[in-house]
């Protein structure tokens, strides 16, 4: 019996040591020690992450999330510039501790972790108002006479290849954006989230959403995290659950999505 208790005690001690070691190696502990939370963000996705041209400061739905998380941790937030093409690589290479919102993607999940989701979007096509009546369905857009613009590194890049396998596809790299190709007349349509599309048609009255029958690819949004750091992932997930219950994300939606 004594031997059984000794083995049980050793197992508990080993488990405690492993847990302590995991915490010490986690980015959570390093963030607390360094006093800063590094957040990779592109700054080009209205209304999620933007850079104010006057102040050069970050603002948006995602910026408020990161700022609130850092405040609850008692640390300062540091925004690290990145692009959609390098977004995943940055969190894997430890250039930042988390990202701003990113669409869930099986390809991204192969190398990076995700938090719980707190929002969802779907894909819609944008075009110039002058082409109203020319395109009325997804099928209309999938033909050799249509040029589709997408931004490198976004989930829309690969989705466009599937949806528009007959069309010509232009891929632009940040800081350029897909919708700018439509504005410049180099593309007939661009594909983005319904969230960004709603903001773009307000910002650029010459643009409109193609009147297709519903969006494509409904996708949850979450933040990218280091895949092997379960301690840090757990902390962020617990924070998201708590903030959801307290109405934080509903407040952000009212603030940023109804403007």
Could you describe each region identified by the protein language model?
Residues 25-102, 110:
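Extracytoplasmic small-molecule ligand-binding "clamshell" domains
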Residues 26, 155-169, 209-212, 240-259:
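Ligand-binding clefts/hinges and TM-proximal coupling segments of bilobed small-molecule sensing domains
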Residues 28, 58, 62, 109-121, ...:
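A structural signal for short loop-to-beta-strand junctions that line the ligand-binding cleft
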Residues 49-55, 66-75, 137-142, 156-173, ...:
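Ligand-binding cleft/hinge of the Venus flytrap
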Residues 63, 79-89, 170-184, 219:
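Short helix-initiation/N-cap motifs at beta->coil->alpha
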Residues 86, 102-111, 158-162, 183-184, ...:
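A ligand-binding cleft/hinge motif common to bilobed small-molecule-binding domains
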Residues 120-124, 198-241, 258-259:
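Periplasmic-binding protein-like
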Residues 129-146:
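Flexible hinge/capping segments at coil-to-helix
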């Amino acid at each position: 019996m004594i031997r059984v208790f000794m083995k049980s005690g050793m197992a508990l001690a080993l488990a405690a040591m492993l847990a302590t070691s995991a915490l010490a190696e986690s980015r959570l502990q390093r963030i607390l020690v360094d006093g800063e939370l590094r957040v990779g963000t592109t700054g080009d996705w209205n209304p999620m992450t933007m850079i104010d041209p006057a102040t050069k400061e970050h603002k948006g739905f995602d910026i408020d999330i990161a700022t609130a998380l850092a405040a609850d941790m008692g640390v300062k937030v540091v925004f690290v510039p990145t692009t959609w093409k390098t977004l995943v690589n940055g969190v894997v290479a430890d250039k930042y501790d988390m990202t701003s919102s990113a669409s869930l993607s099986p390809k991204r999940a192969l190398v990076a972790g995700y938090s719980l989701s707190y929002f969802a979007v779907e894909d819609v096509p944008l075009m110039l108002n002058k082409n109203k009546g020319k395109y009325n369905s997804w099928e209309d857009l999938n033909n050799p006479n249509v040029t589709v613009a997408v931004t490198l590194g976004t989930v829309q890049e690969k989705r466009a290849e599937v949806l528009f396998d007959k069309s010509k596809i232009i891929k632009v790299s940040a800081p350029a954006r897909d919708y700018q190709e439509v504005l410049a007349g180099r593309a007939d349509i661009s594909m983005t989230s319904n969230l960004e599309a709603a903001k773009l048609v307000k910002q650029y009255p010459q643009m409109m959403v193609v009147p297709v029958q519903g969006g494509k690819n409904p996708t949850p949004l979450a933040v990218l995290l280091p895949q092997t750091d379960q301690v840090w992932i757990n902390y962020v997930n617990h924070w998201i659950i708590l903030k959801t219950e307290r109405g934080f994300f509903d407040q952000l939606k009212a603030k940023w999505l109804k403007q």
